Amino acid sequence: MAHKKGQGSSRNGRDSNAQRRGVKVYGGQSIHAGSIIIRQLGTKIHPGNNVGMGKDYTLFSLIDGVVKFERLDKKRKKVSVYATA
């Protein structure tokens, strides 16, 4: 009997890359126009004032300003960007 295992016997050894979702800029932080605020699956957080949404639900800033997380109603949240005076 062989004292070493044959080549190619393992069926493991695969792993997918992380998708790097989540909040990229937090409340109170300043942001430039076009910068990503949140990467998400579905509208966990909705776009508010001066925030756009990409086809993959990514939220991004439309203006330079400060990020603010707010309530839309009891269940839903939104993120807005307000210009600094």
Curated annotation (Swiss-Prot):
Gene Ontology cellular component annotations, sorted alphabetically: ribonucleoprotein complex; ribosome
GO molecular function: structural constituent of ribosome
Stretches assigned to coiled coil: none
GO biological process: translation
Residue numbers spanned by region Disordered: 1-24
Keywords per UniProt: Ribonucleoprotein, Ribosomal protein
InterPro entries named in the record: Ribosomal_bL27
UniProt key word Ribosomal protein: yes
PANTHER family documented for this protein: LARGE RIBOSOMAL SUBUNIT PROTEIN BL27M, RIBOSOMAL PROTEIN L27
Family: Belongs to the bacterial ribosomal protein bL27 family.
Protein name, per record: Large ribosomal subunit protein bL27
Taxonomic lineage of the native organism: Bacteria, Pseudomonadati, Thermodesulfobacteriota, Syntrophia, Syntrophales
Gene this protein is translated from: rpmA
